Amino acid sequence: GFGSLLGKALKIGTNLL
């Protein structure tokens, strides 16, 4: 669902940091 997409985006964001 949408929560899954949000979690993915957060994971990618923290990866970039």
UniProtKB/Swiss-Prot annotation:
Task: Please tell me in which tissues this protein is expressed.
Answer: Expressed by the skin glands.
What are the protein's UniProt keywords?
A: Amidation, Amphibian defense peptide, Secreted
BP terms from Gene Ontology: defense response
Manganese as a keyword? no
Sequence positions bearing Leucine amide: 17
Main subcellular location of this protein, as a coarse class: secreted
* UniProt keyword Ribonucleoprotein, yes or no: no
Which superkingdom, per the lineage?
Answer: Eukaryota
Q: Where in the cell is it found?
A: Secreted
Gene Ontology terms: cellular component: extracellular region
Q: Which family does it belong to?
A: Belongs to the gastrin/cholecystokinin family.
Q: What is this protein called?
A: Caerulein precursor fragment-related peptide R2
Source species? Xenopus ruwenzoriensis (Uganda clawed frog)
List the taxonomic lineage. Answer: Eukaryota, Metazoa, Chordata, Craniata, Vertebrata
